[in-house]
Amino acid sequence: MVLNHSPPPGLYITGLGSQYPPYLLGPEKLEEFAARFYDVESPGLKKLLQINRSSGIETRSAIRSYESGFATRPEAPTISELAEFYHQAGVDLTTQACKKALRESQISPQHVTHTIGVTCTNQGNPGFDLLVNRKLGLSANVDRMLLHGVGCAGGLAIMRAAAQIACGASMRRKPVRILAFACELCTPNVRHDLAFAEKAPNAENISIAGALFSDAAAAFVLCNEYAMAETEITPLFQLLEWGNSLIPDTVEHMAFFADVDGYRTVLTRDVPQYTKHAIGPMFEKLLPSYQSQIQSSSGEGVGEVAKSLGVSDFDWALHPGGEAIIEGAKQVLGLTEDQLQASREIYRTRGNSSSATVLIVLDRLRSLGKREYVVATSFGPGLAIEMAMLRRCEVDED
């Protein structure tokens, strides 16, 4: 049998939307809150609060202050209470991010063909994506997908899933307009983070999640070439390559699961050591295909440039999982502060909002970064690494 080898489908991000909640909490707020309910001299909690002071985060975005809601009660919220709260506040936050992405794409809700959602801070069936779809007024015939179990890697996992769906549609010569979104409400779980730290038998066994995580939602619209033929807008990015991989023998270093006392986070101090050594091999694996696609779709001059592309030629949307993760990537890859400025800014001013963060960094990179070539990468339980390689559709020549 002879197969016709057609060029890769065209995949374009036409809109991005980020949405933070109204509150910003400094490290001192967590200390004051912890002192109200817990023994701050216990070894585990004392260590967590030390990390909180030295995390490099100036403010974390929060859906509520430490003076309202669950924070005012003597007992921690139950999982069912957290779920009910998420279905209101989380769905509202996600809807706002989605509206921004749709507005920039100039796509009406009725023309969305697929939705892909992700979260690790809400469980249940039907998933929160159905509530978002209803609030946006999407068609009842929209194809829905909700990812689970991918944690902080979720933002790029939904981009990978969107790309695969769009490629399949292109093979069938059908237009797709995929609305993908991520939302995490981490701060309502802080009572459980503090309680687990207080009970820890020693300072070595604590999770540092209570000092890092914040709340946010993000969304993007991805269209294939058939959908782009029906619009006159200039897309933001072309998505050219993507991939994911597990880092061997690391499954015990990151987790988030329902415990009898609430949601529990596992995040060991060894994570940055593993993640920093996983980025380079994934980049080298994806680069040849990325270069080939640029060469085949560009003029001779750009094609020659593509042959020599390396780490230093890209703006990096690195998931800022922590100060050590950012520093580790910078050290191993030889990145400059200029290449990491969006990741630094989001981490410093908003903290780590899990799956939504890398998409927010990519959104911020639009105004901070200047390079034509962009790579985004994030990490999640497994340990897993996700990577996407993009190309700006409009480049500032200044």
UniProtKB/Swiss-Prot annotation:
Any idea which GO molecular function terms this record carries?
Answer: acyltransferase activity, transferring groups other than amino-acyl groups
* Reaction catalysed by this enzyme: 11 malonyl-CoA + acetyl-CoA + S-adenosyl-L-methionine + 12 NADPH + 22 H(+) = soppiline B + S-adenosyl-L-homocysteine + 12 CO2 + 12 NADP(+) + 12 CoA + 8 H2O
Top EC class of this enzyme: transferase
- Which parts of the sequence bind CoA? K47, L48, L49, Q50, I51, N52, R53, S54, L267, G321, G322, E323, A324
InterPro entries from the UniProt entry: Chalcone/stilbene_synt_C (IPR012328), Chalcone/stilbene_synt_N (IPR001099), Polyketide_synthase_type-III (IPR011141), Thiolase-like (IPR016039)
Is the Mitochondrion keyword given for this protein?
A: no
**Annotated catalytic residues:** C152
The pathway it acts in is: Secondary metabolite biosynthesis
Q: What is its EC number?
A: 2.3.1.-
Query: What are the record keywords, sorted?
Result: Acyltransferase, Transferase
Q: What does this protein do?
A: Type III polyketide synthase; part of the gene cluster that mediates the biosynthesis of the alkylresorcinols called soppilines. The biosynthesis starts with the HR-PKS pspA-catalyzed carbon chain assembly through nine chain elongation cycles, using acetyl CoA and malonyl CoA as a starter and extender units, respectively, to produce the polyketide soppiline A. In the first round, the KR, DH, and CMeT domains work to produce 2-methyl-2-butenyl thioester.
Family of this protein:
Belongs to the thiolase-like superfamily. Chalcone/stilbene synthases family.
Q: What is this protein called?
A: Type III polyketide synthase pspB
Species of origin reads Penicillium soppii
Q: What is the lineage of its organism?
A: Eukaryota, Fungi, Dikarya, Ascomycota, Pezizomycotina
